[in-house]
Amino acid sequence: MGTHGLEVPASARLLFISGQIPVRPDGGVPADFEGQCDAVWDNLLAVLASARMRPEHLVKVTTYLTRRDQAEINGRVRRERLGEVRPALTVVIVETFAAEWLLEIEAIAAA
């Protein structure tokens, strides 16, 4: 079905990843949007790895952007991080919890 829908077998182990924000382990927040994308994906992939999962286990990704003009960079960074992996995807324009956060990403993985 491609990225319009992915079926998860009943026996799969599910991981629900809370919204990942652009805060690095040292507490810093990158000033630019691309740096924030990298920080968010670093955080999300670390959560996946902690559950012994990889990007190909992602079945659903929801990205919250603060501006529509961020979509192109967001898509490019996502494709760089995920390669050929194409989970079901939703992108929403919102106001984030903290003004300095330019995006947040949550996900569901199944293995």
Segments predicted by a language model, with ranges:
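Short, polar/acidic, helix-capping and beta-turn segments at strand->helix junctions
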Residues: 1-111
